[in-house]
Amino acid sequence: GAGRLPSLAAQAAPLDPTGDRSELDGLAEAAFQAGGGGEKAGLGTSMHSWLERLTLDPDGTLSKAPENAVADLAAIAQCLSDNNIQVYETPGRRWVEPFVITPLPAAQWAAGSPDMIANVQGCETPAIVDLKTGRDPRQAPMSPAIQLAVYAYAEWAWWAKDEPLEAAPEKREDVGYILHAPFGTGTCELIELNLEEGWQAAWLATYVRVARRDMKRFYTFPEEPIELTDFQKQML
């Protein structure tokens, strides 16, 4: 983006990385959009909506898909077939993008929607399967492992505002799967993640988040009040 618009680099050159962070963030976003990053990210996001159609009717979906997505969708369809990935179904439910809710320690909760709960490679117990169209999750595996672990340990599912919560199905809690299909590459790879490690990291992150909410407990206040810095006041 900065290569297309040299003025962005010129504007950034005199700025201080610490003191001028907001201005630098704005220039970085402008460079991202100028480089086509926003369009690419949007097209990658649209792949999630095509995924459900692909699991129902691969050939029909490919015939209706936009030209710039056909190669990627064909690769995803081939990966689904090669690994015998079948969307899990229960009476009246097809477990694609369910909204699931997971209890966490310290009376916390997490919720979200995996792309699908599916049987993978013939395993009778379904697993979490999520599509990623950006960078290789193996470059920074902790975040997706936490995300998929939270989905895998979900206890409830919620389908619509006028419907009550229902129990989430039994799922594999040891592993989850990423369909890694970087947009525009025409490739798709199934990546297995260790969700037992992801779940431990989710607990750790929860405790850290709770601890940071109540910073006052880390102070031992004297009888006479002390003058706090502006930063300390913000944290309290």
Label every model-predicted segment.
Residues G1-A111:
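Metal-dependent nuclease catalytic cores that hydrolyze phosphodiester bonds in DNA/RNA
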Residues D16, D20, D25, D57-D59, ...:
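Acidic-enriched, low-complexity/disordered segments with a strong bias for Aspartate over Glutamate
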Residues R217-L236:
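Glycine- and charge-rich intrinsically disordered segments
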